[in-house]
C-alpha cells in the first residue's frame, strides 16, 4: 500500500476528521487530523491497519505564529506532529493536529503509545501544550520553577535578552525543595503488602548513572518496586540554538548532541539540508563520511564495552580498550584536526580532503583491532561473573521495544534485524557488504554481544572504504556550498552573484519541511527541519535514541535488584547530552 492509498484509507475510515494531506518533498505522507480524533487515528494505525505502524518515533510541537510560508495547511497556532514507523512496510507517516496558540490543549496518546508520555511532557515544557489524561503533566527538561515555555517564538533565544538571574537564599531553598524525591510527585507507591517502601535517590551524582541523571526508586529491601527517571540536568537548548544560527553555523552543535558520536551527529542534519537544496554529494565525500562515521562507531562501542565490564565488576578491560580508542583518535585527529567534535562535514561535502598518508594510518588501525577483540572476548564475554551479571537481566522482547521506541542495538538484541543503513541506505551504504548483528533474548548480555559484533562489522566497512576510495571532488558544485573556482571568479563577476547571499547572510533554504534519518551509535537519530525561506531554521526538531531508551527504565526496572539496575543502565549505552539536548 502506497502513502496515497493509506491517506485514502484514513479518509474513508474517519471522514471529515481527516483534514487532508500536506504537500511536502518527504518520502512519507503528512496528514492533518482533528484533535478530537487523534487517539483513534493513532490506535487505528498501530493496531488495525495492515502491516501496522507499531512505533512512535517522535512527537513534537511547532509554534506557527511567526511562520510566513504555510501554503496549503490549515490554520494553526501550535501544531503537534507525531511521526510513526511501520517496519514491515519500511514506511513512515506523519500526523499533525492544529491547536490554539493561546491555550493549546489536546488529548494524550500515551494510552496508545506508552513512549508518548515523555514527548508530551516535553511539548508542555517547551511550548505549554496541555495533554488531557496525561498522568505526569509536568516539566521534564527544565526545573520545576521555570517560568514560561522557551521554545515559543515570543521567548528570547539568548541569556542576555532575559532578566538578570539572582540566586537568593529563599530561591535556593525553594528549588532544593522542588527537587526533593517526593513519592506523590513522581507517582511512586509508598507501601506494598502493608510494608513501607524506601524511597531512594539514585543519582544524579553517581558513577553508575553515566552522567548527570537520577532515578527515584521505591525499594522493598534491595528489590526495585518502581522507578522514575528524572532528566534535564544536561539540557542546553540545542533546538532553540538552531533558530539563531545559520544553516552552516549550526553544524558544530550537531556534534555535541551525542558528544561520543562525533561526525555521526552531523549526518542526519546534512541529509535534511542537502535534500532541501537538491544537492548531490560527490562519491568521494560520501565514502569519507561513511568511513569516519564507522570509526566513531567503533570508538563509542569500545567505551561501552569497557565501562559495561567495569559496571559488572571487571576493572582491567576498560584500560586496555582506552588504548585502542586512543589509536582510533589518532586516526581521526590526523584526518580532521580534532578528536571528539571535528565539525568535519559541510553542506554538500567535507571541509577538506583526506591528508597524505591517511590510508596507512587507517590500515594500521584495522590490522590492530581484530586480535584485541579476540582477547576481550575471553576477558569479558566468556567471563563467568560477567555472564552471571548480564544473562537474563533487563530483558525485553521486540514488541515491548517497539512500544517504547527502542532502536539501534537495543532493538536488534531482541532478534529484530532493523538497521537504517540496510533498510534505508544513505551516504552510499547500499554499496557496502556488512551484516546486521542480532541477539536472541534481549537482555544485557545480548546488547553487549550485538555491539561487539558491530565493531567487527564497522571494521569490515572501513576496510572497504580504504580499498575502494574514489577520486574526485569533496564538495558539490553548488552556490549554497562552495565558492566558484578562482579562474571563473576572475573571468566575470556574474559567477559570484549566486554565492553572495550565502556568504554574507548564510545559505537560504527553500521554504518547506525536510527530514534526515541515520543509524547513529545509539540508534535512530532524526532531524526534522522547517525552513521559512530564511538563512536560519524556523524549527529544528532533534529526535535522539537515548531519550526514548531512558524512558523505558520505568517499565523494565521493577522486580530487579539494585545491582541489576547498574548492569541494565550500562547496557542501554545512553549519553545524557543525547537525552537532554
Swiss-Prot record:
NDH-1 shuttles electrons from NADH, via FMN and iron-sulfur (Fe-S) centers, to quinones in the respiratory chain. The immediate electron acceptor for the enzyme in this species is believed to be ubiquinone. Couples the redox reaction to proton translocation (for every two electrons transferred, four hydrogen ions are translocated across the cytoplasmic membrane), and thus conserves the redox energy in a proton gradient. The keyword Transport applies. InterPro entries: NADH_DH_suCD (IPR023062), NADH_Q_OxRdtase_suD (IPR001135), NADH_quin_OxRdtase_su_C/D-like (IPR037232), NADH_UbQ_OxRdtase_30kDa_su (IPR001268), NADH_UbQ_OxRdtase_49kDa_CS (IPR014029), NDH1_su_D/H (IPR022885), NiFe-Hase_large (IPR029014). Keywords: Cell inner membrane, Cell membrane, Membrane, Multifunctional enzyme, NAD, Quinone, Translocase, Transport, Ubiquinone. Its EC number is 7.1.1.-. Gene3D superfamilies: Cytochrome-c3 Hydrogenase, chain B, NADH:ubiquinone oxidoreductase, 30kDa subunit. Residues 1-172 are annotated as: NADH dehydrogenase I subunit C. PANTHER family: NADH-QUINONE OXIDOREDUCTASE SUBUNIT C_D, NADH-UBIQUINONE OXIDOREDUCTASE 49 KDA SUBUNIT. It catalyses: a quinone + NADH + 5 H(+)(in) = a quinol + NAD(+) + 4 H(+)(out). It is found in: Cell inner membrane. In the N-terminal section; belongs to the complex I 30 kDa subunit family. In the C-terminal section; belongs to the complex I 49 kDa subunit family. The gene is nuoC. One of its GO terms (molecular function) is NAD binding. NDH-1 is composed of 13 different subunits. Subunits NuoB, CD, E, F, and G constitute the peripheral sector of the complex. NCBIfam families: NuoD, PRK06075.1, PRK11742.1. This is NADH-quinone oxidoreductase subunit C/D. It is a peripheral membrane protein. One of its GO terms (cellular component) is plasma membrane.
Amino acid at each position: 500500500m502506497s502513502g496515497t492509498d493509506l491517506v485514502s484509507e484514513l479518509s474513508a475510515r474517519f471522514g471529515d476528521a481527516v483534514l487532508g494531506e500536506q504537500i511536502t518533498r518527504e518520502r512519507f505522507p503528512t496528514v492533518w487530523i482533528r484533535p478530537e480524533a487523534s487517539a483513534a487515528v493513532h490506535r487505528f494505525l498501530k493496531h488495525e491497519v495492515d502491516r501496522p505502524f507499531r512505533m512512535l518515533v517522535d512527537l513534537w510541537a511547532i509554534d506557527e505564529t511567526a511562520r510566513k510560508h504555510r501554503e496549503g495547511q490549515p490554520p494553526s497556532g501550535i501544531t503537534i506532529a507525531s511521526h510513526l514507523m511501520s517496519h514491515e512496510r519500511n514506511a513512515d507517516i506523519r500526523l499533525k493536529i492544529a491547536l490554539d496558540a493561546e491555550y493549546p490543549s489536546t488529548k494524550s496518546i500515551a494510552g496508545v503509545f506508552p513512549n508518548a508520555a515523555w514527548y508530551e511532557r516535553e511539548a508542555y515544557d517547551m511550548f505549554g501544550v496541555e495533554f488531557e489524561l496525561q498522568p505526569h503533566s509536568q516539566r521534564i527538561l527544565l526545573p520545576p520553577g521555570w517560568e514560561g515555555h522557551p521554545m515559543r517564538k515570543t521567548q528570547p533565544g539568548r541569556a542576555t535578552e532575559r532578566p538578570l538571574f539572582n540566586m537568593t537564599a529563599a530561591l535556593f531553598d525553594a528549588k532544593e525543595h522542588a527537587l526533593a524525591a517526593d513519592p506523590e510527585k513522581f507517582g511512586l507507591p509508598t507501601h506494598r503488602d502493608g510494608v513501607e517502601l524506601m524511597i531512594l535517590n539514585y543519582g544524579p551524582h553517581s558513577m553508575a548513572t553515566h552522567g548527570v541523571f537520577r532515578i527515584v526508586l521505591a525499594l522493598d529491601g534491595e528489590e526495585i518496586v518502581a522507578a522514575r527517571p528524572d532528566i534535564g540536568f544536561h539540557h542546553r537548548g540545542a533546538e532553540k540554538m538552531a533558530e539563531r544560527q545559520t544553516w552552516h553555523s549550526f553544524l558544530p552543535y550537531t556534534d555535541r548532541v551525542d558528544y561520543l558520536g562525533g561526525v555521526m551527529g552531523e549526518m542526519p542534519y546534512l541529509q535534511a539540508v542537502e535534500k532541501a537544496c537538491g544537492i548531490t554529494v560527490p562519491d568521494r565525500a560520501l565514502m569519507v563520511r561513511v568511513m569516519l562515521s564507522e570509526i566513531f562507531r567503533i570508538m563509542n562501542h569500545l567505551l561501552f564495552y569497557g565501562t559495561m565490564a567495569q559496571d559488572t565488576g571487571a576493572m582491567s578491560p576498560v584500560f586496555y580498550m582506552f588504548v585502542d580508542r586512543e589509536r582510533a583518535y589518532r586516526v581521526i585527529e590526523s584526518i580532521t584536526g580534532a578528536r571528539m567534535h571535528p565539525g568535519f562535514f559541510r553542506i554538500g561535502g567535507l571541509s577538506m580532503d583526506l591528508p597524505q598518508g591517511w590510508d596507512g594510518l587507517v590500515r594500521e588501525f584495522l590490522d590492530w583491532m581484530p586480535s584485541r577483540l579476540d582477547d576481550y572476548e575471553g576477558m569479558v564475554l566468556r567471563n563467568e561473573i560477567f555472564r552471571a551479571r548480564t544473562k537474563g537481566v533487563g530483558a525485553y522482547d521486540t514488541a515491548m521495544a517497539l512500544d517504547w521506541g527502542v532502536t539501534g542495538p537495543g532493538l536488534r538484541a531482541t532478534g529484530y534485524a532493523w538497521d537504517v543503513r540496510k533498510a534505508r541506505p544513505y551516504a552510499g551504504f547500499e554499496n557496502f557488504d556488512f551484516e546486521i548483528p542480532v541477539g536472541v533474548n534481549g537482555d544485557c548480555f545480548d546488547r553487549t554481544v550485538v555491539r561487539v559484533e558491530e565493531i567487527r562489522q564497522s571494521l569490515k566497512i572501513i576496510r572497504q572504504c580504504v580499498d575502494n576510495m574514489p577520486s574526485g571532488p569533496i564538495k558539490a558544485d553548488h552556490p549554497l556550498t562552495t565558492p566558484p573556482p578562482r579562474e571563473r571568479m576572475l573571468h566575470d563577476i556574474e559567477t559570484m552573484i549566486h554565492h553572495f547571499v550565502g556568504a554574507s547572510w548564510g545559505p537560504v533554504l527553500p521554504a518547506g519541511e525536510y527530514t534526515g534519518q541515520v543509524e547513529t551509535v545509539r540508534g535512530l537519530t532524526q532531524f526534522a527541519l522547517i525552513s521559512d525561506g530564511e538563512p536560519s531554521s524556523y524549527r529544528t526538531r532533534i529526535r535522539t535514541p537515548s531519550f526514548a531508551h531512558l524512558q523505558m527504565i520505568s517499565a523494565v526496572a521493577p522486580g530487579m535488584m539494585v545491582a541489576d539496575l547498574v548492569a541494565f543502565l550500562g547496557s542501554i549505552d545512553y549519553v545524557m547530552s543525547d537525552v537532554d539536548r
